[in-house]
């Protein structure tokens, strides 16, 4: 009888210890399930938020680009119209919108107009001197000669003014050429220096690639649940772990049944 009592007491303590372990297992599974559910909810909430951000960014970018393009096009068109009006009226002076080239063209047009008037004047004066239209050829008057000389002088002054002032710089350029040749030497050294600098960068990239290769060569212990999560089946994340937990729970329940039956048998044996 003493042996049966001692066995029943030992069985009772074993039963209590198994109950404590199983309660800890149930609590762990509950925490894991709650964590998996929170992850799924966060993933589901992140999808519509990213779509709204993309649509807002696209609409803002499109509206900004359209308004900027329209305003730029309109301003450019108005600028071209002003330039065309300024070029069409040769008699008006050059405004701020026209460039230096337009001013030179207006001066040449004025010179041509002056020369055309001077060339037309002798015909009128010759017509006045020859009212009857005789076949004799008359020489131009002194006034016509003076106007032609004045027009030639104006053309010479314009050609002198149109000469660019860069000729003096060109004449002085041979003295500056040896300085440029001296400056070309450090530029050649500078072109060689990036090649020297690129060598350690290549070494660094090689080491970086080697490190990645060594990391990829290590075996990775991934469970079925992690593979499913990486494949894109977000709904199945944690499904395999929950199934394993359920199987372990079933085994523990069987153990409980066996222990309860053993305690009942021992208790009947003790009291009987």
Swiss-Prot record:
Q: Kindly give the InterPro entries that the UniProt entry links to this protein.
A: MSA2
Where do the segments described as Polymorphic region lie?
44-198
Locate the compositionally biased regions of type Gly residues: 51-82
Q: What is its main location?
A: membrane
Q: How is this protein annotated for GO cellular component?
A: plasma membrane; side of membrane
Cellular localization per UniProt = Cell membrane
> Keyword Membrane on this protein?
yes
Query: What residue ranges constitute the propeptide?
Result: 247-272
**6 X 4 AA tandem repeats of G-G-S-A: annotated span:** 53-76
Q: Please indicate which superkingdom the organism of origin belongs to.
A: Eukaryota
**Which protein is depicted?**
Merozoite surface protein 2
Which gene is the coding source of this polypeptide chain? MSP2
